[in-house]
């Protein structure tokens, strides 16, 4: 029988659960996110997980949120706009399967749908900030949307990293002009 963990602080329990879920998502995708397996891994009852996360979708959101925070902690602060956008696109590529899972789960889960809307808004804000030096204020929104569409389109193709970067660089430079490489 799983042990009780009354001596462990709530925040520590939450952190353990989210970290275990994060590890499963990174290693095996959504299919590996099993509440029962996480409970066994942590030595707790399955209901203990549901005490903190009412549904598997709530746990998915918390784990993906952790992954995004890890990524954003490493984002470049300086550099040419095109290089920052390429960095952004490569991070999106690394988690393409999770992004597609989020999009799919959003169709049937309001908690995931709300999370997806927030993530898209955050990613768009990051792009706007990255492009602010090379796009005029009256074109920044369209530039961000065009670059986002370019990134998403290229990421859907099954091509090498070198080819992906070349296509993205080509598209970004055409969209934003020569100042984007400065």
Predicted region positions:
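N-terminal intrinsically disordered/low-complexity leader segments
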Residues: 1-12, 181-182
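Helix-turn-helix
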Residues: 16, 20-58, 62
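Short helix-capping/turn signature of helix-turn-helix
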Residues: 53, 102-109
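Amphipathic alpha-helical packing segments from all-alpha helical-bundle domains
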Residues: 83, 91-94, 110-145, 166-173
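Short, hydrophobic secondary-structure boundary micro-motifs
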Residues: 98-104, 114-115
